[in-house]
Amino acid sequence: MQVLVRDNNVDQALRALKKKMQREGIFREMKMRGYYEKPSEKRAREKAEAIRRTRKLARKRAQREGIVSNGRTASVR
């Protein structure tokens, strides 16, 4: 991964690098590879993540179509 340093502004380059790494999922990957994960545990985790993603997508679709409220309650006075 490559980031340009402009005008010797290393802090800005580091922020850009961190943002790129976050988007690519490198931090999450490093965390996951920090210890051995059994293949059966990996399958179970991936299946749970897929279910979570599907539910989140369905919830967003329902909100967009107006079927379900967004979960916030309006205060009545």
UniProtKB/Swiss-Prot annotation:
Q: Where is this region: Disordered?
A: 38-77
GO biological-process terms attached to the record: translation
Q: Basic residues: which segments have biased composition?
A: 53-62
Q: What domain of life does the UniProt record list for this protein's source?
A: Bacteria
Q: Name one GO molecular function term.
A: structural constituent of ribosome
Q: Name one GO cellular component term.
A: ribonucleoprotein complex
Q: Which PROSITE patterns match?
A: RIBOSOMAL_S21
Record keyword Lipid metabolism present? no
Q: What are the Basic and acidic residues biased-composition ranges?
A: 38-52
Alphabetized UniProt keyword annotations = Ribonucleoprotein, Ribosomal protein
Q: Which NCBIfam families match?
A: S21p
Q: Describe the family membership recorded for this protein in Swiss-Prot or TrEMBL.
A: Belongs to the bacterial ribosomal protein bS21 family.
Q: Write the protein's name.
A: Small ribosomal subunit protein bS21
Species this chain originates from: Bartonella bacilliformis (strain ATCC 35685 / KC583 / Herrer 020/F12,63)
Source organism lineage?
A: Bacteria, Pseudomonadati, Pseudomonadota, Alphaproteobacteria, Hyphomicrobiales
